[in-house]
Amino acid sequence: MKKPGVIFLILLAAFLSACGASQRPALVQNRSLWESQAIQHYRFNLKVGCFCPWNALMPLTIEVRNGEIISMVASNGGDITPYLDTFRAHATIESLFDLVDSAISKRVYSLVVQYDPKYGFPASIVIDPSRMIMDDETGYYVTNLEVLP
């Protein structure tokens, strides 16, 4: 006779593994929308929200051309040098798509993504890697995307 607890755990594991998989179609669809527009030069604001030392620098204004970051400045004019490597890791739309893809693959505890309806880029990404760790959530918020010539 099977124990109810074992059945519950099996069902819970199946449900949780399906959560990440259910987000992959939206990722694929929106990434295709973004890529279909062949946007090579753009500027946007990025706010990274977390319990991090750089919160006063947010949002960043980032300009990207041909996949390369050509400028990145803090909204308050502060020095971003100490955090440059961290910021560069998520400073292109392509890298934000990769971040979502990685979170889905890793089956993080919670992943909430909202995509821009016109361009398809991830406008809001909130990741909570672990249910067991408090205050480890990170949010990435893209605003004011401007396509440049």
Where would I find each of the regions flagged by the language model?
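Short, surface-exposed coil-to-beta transition loops
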Residues: W54-P59, V108, D135-T138
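Short, exposed beta-strand-loop hairpins at the edges of beta-sheets
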Residues: P122-Y140
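Bacterial signal peptide processing site
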Residues: G20-Q23
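A short-motif feature that recognizes glycine-rich, charge-decorated loops
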Residues: E68-V108
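C-terminal motif of bacterial Sec signal peptides marking the signal peptidase cleavage site
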Residues: L16-A18
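A short, Trp-centered hydrophobic/proline-enriched beta-strand micro-motif
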Residues: Q37-G49
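Short, surface-exposed binding/anchoring microloops in extracellular/periplasmic proteins
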Residues: V48-G67, S71-V73
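Bacterial N-terminal signal peptides that target proteins for export
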Residues: M1-F8
